[in-house]
Amino acid sequence: MAINAQEISALIKQQIENFKPNFDVTETGVVTYIGDGIARAHGLENVMSGELLNFENGSYGMAQNLESTDVGIIILGDFTDIREGDTIRRTGKIMEVPVGESLIGRVVDPLGRPVDGLGEIHTDKTRPVEAPAPGVMQRKSVSEPLQTGLKAIDALVPIGRGQRELIIGDRQTGKTTIAIDTILNQKDQDMICIYVAIGQKESTVRTQVETLRQYGALDYTIVVTASASQPSPLLFLAPYAGVAMAEEFMYQGKHVLIVYDDLSKQAVAYRELLLLLRRPPGREAFPGDVFYLHSRLLERSAKVSDELGGGSITALPFIETQAGDISAYIATNVISITDGQIFLGDGLFNAGIRPAIDAGSSVSRVGGSAQIKAMKKVAGTLRIDLASYRELEAFTKFGSDLDAATQAKLNRGRRTVEVLKQPVHKPLPVEKQVTILYALTHGFLDTVPVDDIVRFEEEFHAFFDAQHPEILETIRDTKDLPEEAVLDAAITEFLNQSSFQ
């Protein structure tokens, strides 16, 4: 076979023209310092703020400080295997977490990895932990109620879907109990719940998960946990991971309740990280952008417009106070960001008034527009009556003689306090709340001894369930009260049959 030099040269020329170099170009740097959950690296010239970086041992970090000579990195996970001189690579991506239906019923860490021992989570969807909040024109007004099942909240400080309502109080005043009871009350309410535990003891988180499982609430709940034993970067990231998971459902038109327990510990973790990264400290040694830390998180909770699906994220952030000081730095920051706050007093808690809600210091700025008509009618004057009772109660300590009208107000106030008490993990449907509050505000309980109020309420609800379910059904379906004569007749019938007359 004759070799044609012309053909060979044409073939070589064609191969050269069609050659496409396939280089894997990755910008790398060198770790110059490692310790306390942070690292410094030199050589990453074009790294972005918040970019995910890959260490030689397979661990990941997130670029936090971009300086002229090096980059400050927070390490996501264990840093014991990382050494000075190790190579670090850019990934070109920002931090993302897995999202979707497959996370429901699972307990995960802030990176979306399962920690409940139930195997891998199979999902191919991810969302960035840092995402812009919905814009002004992408939002709708809060108009649908979120029923907590707690009389004191649904009557005095109602919460709407898409609202941010701060729960603030000292440690051991029942903050977590309110959140767990609210999650339990979302059963059959077409609501997905996300409980973010930040800096909690692992035994405490285990207890909360078992409570949710016992009452069947884990069927619609995701638990994101960054326990006290984990590195600070995970505590800092946990709330952002939780809200990223929530956004996936919100933009599908679903309603989500997210609980941050608690943001005080996130702020402390953030302060620790940025002091280690040598950011200049401000008030109480917190970095200057600690307000932005929480505002960019809580602004992602909203009720979005119908064009975006009409879904919502309702946020219940917690802040722990010291000796009831709600004027502390982080507390005032979060109060100014949220749409209201529920203040829990340790004095009330120790006096046996649980939930220990201080009606005078608690407010819901937008929840009133979401409250159902029936509750508005029966609870309209309840807050004023309660405040008036507290004021009069203070005067009675002087031992002065009281006129009949003042005595009647005190009697009604004592019964109001008793009615608003509620046992743990027993949320009450809104129609039952309305009937007992109607009986209270219309004077049907004025002759019932204060010590018998709890027994009265139990028998009252049992009577309505058995004898007048149609009244409860009317309230549930129409969101309004039936005719007063019908309710009055039913309550009078109960009193005639009971031992309370």
From Swiss-Prot:
Where is it mostly found? membrane
Coiled coil feature spans: none
Class of this enzyme: translocase
Summarize the protein's role: Produces ATP from ADP in the presence of a proton gradient across the membrane. The alpha chain is a regulatory subunit.
Short name of any one Pfam family annotated for the protein: ATP-synt_ab_C
Spell out the protein name for this chain. Answer: ATP synthase subunit alpha
Q: Where is this site: Required for activity?
A: 362
Question: Disulfide bonds, which pairs?
Answer: none
- State the UniProt keywords alphabetically: ATP synthesis, ATP-binding, Cell membrane, CF(1), Hydrogen ion transport, Ion transport, Membrane, Nucleotide-binding, Translocase, Transport
Tell me how this protein assembles: F-type ATPases have 2 components, CF(1) - the catalytic core - and CF(0) - the membrane proton channel. CF(1) has five subunits: alpha(3), beta(3), gamma(1), delta(1), epsilon(1). CF(0) has three main subunits: a(1), b(2) and c(9-12). The alpha and beta chains form an alternating ring which encloses part of the gamma chain. CF(1) is attached to CF(0) by a central stalk formed by the gamma and epsilon chains, while a peripheral stalk is formed by the delta and b chains.
This entry's Enzyme Commission designation comes to: 7.1.2.2
CC annotations in GO = plasma membrane; proton-transporting ATP synthase complex
Residues of the signal peptide: none
The UniProt entry, under InterPro entries, shows: ATP_synth_asu-like_sf, ATP_synth_asu_C, ATP_synth_asu_C_sf, ATP_synth_F1_a_nt-bd_dom, ATP_synth_F1_asu, ATPase_F1/V1/A1_a/bsu_N, ATPase_F1/V1/A1_a/bsu_N_sf, ATPase_F1/V1/A1_a/bsu_nucl-bd
Q: How does it sit in the membrane?
A: Peripheral membrane protein
